[in-house]
Amino acid sequence: KVIDVKCTSPKQCLPPCKAQFGD
C-alpha cells in the first residue's frame, strides 16, 4: 500500500490513512 505523503503522523491522518500506519 502506498503511504499518502501528506500523512506524516497517524495522529493527524484520517482513518484510512491511519490504517496505513497500522494504527
UniProtKB/Swiss-Prot annotation:
Do the record's keywords include Protein transport? no
The UniProt record lists the keyword Secreted: yes
Where, subcellularly, is it found?
Answer: Secreted
Q: Which Pfam families match?
A: Toxin_2
**Distribution of this protein across tissues and organs:** Expressed by the venom gland.
Superkingdom assignment: Eukaryota
GO CC terms of this entry: extracellular region
Domain observations: Has the structural arrangement of an alpha-helix connected to antiparallel beta-sheets by disulfide bonds (CS-alpha/beta).
Task performed by this protein: Potent selective inhibitor of Kv1/KCNA voltage-gated potassium channels.
What protein am I looking at?
Answer: Hongotoxin-4
Source species: Centruroides limbatus (Bark scorpion)
